[in-house]
Amino acid sequence: MVADTDAQAQRIADEAYPRWRDGMDFLWRRSNLDFTLKDIYPGDFAALQAIGHGIAGSPATVRDYLARLQAETGVNYVLCQMVFGSMSFEQAEQSIRLFASEVMPAFET
């Protein structure tokens, strides 16, 4: 999730993620089963970020995170879920636009 500021991106992600997470474990709950992916997809976005499975921030924060990931692992591509949970169209559009215009160019070769 990319927004103009770290605080704005974090707020949007914190609000949107629970709805997405609820949908992820719906079938497990419906079948009275334990959600087996809870370690990969914890209950809130802060926990998701803490284990390195999510990022929300300004373009600079997201760019720095991806550059660090690339330097540490040699990764040459990432899969991004740009829209999730209860994000509005406007929030999603802004995130995608900022990612395309201010994050991606840093990784073009």
Which residue ranges define each predicted feature?
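C-terminal helical cap(s) of enzyme catalytic domains, especially alpha/beta-barrels
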Residues: 91-108
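An alpha-helical appendage that flanks or caps ligand/catalytic pockets
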Residues: 1-75, 108
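Hydrophobic faces of well-ordered beta-strands that scaffold small-molecule active sites
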Residues: 78-80
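Active-site-proximal loop/turn and secondary-structure-junction residues that shape catalytic pockets
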Residues: 1-2, 84-86
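Short, small-residue-enriched loops and turns at beta-alpha junctions
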Residues: 30, 85-88
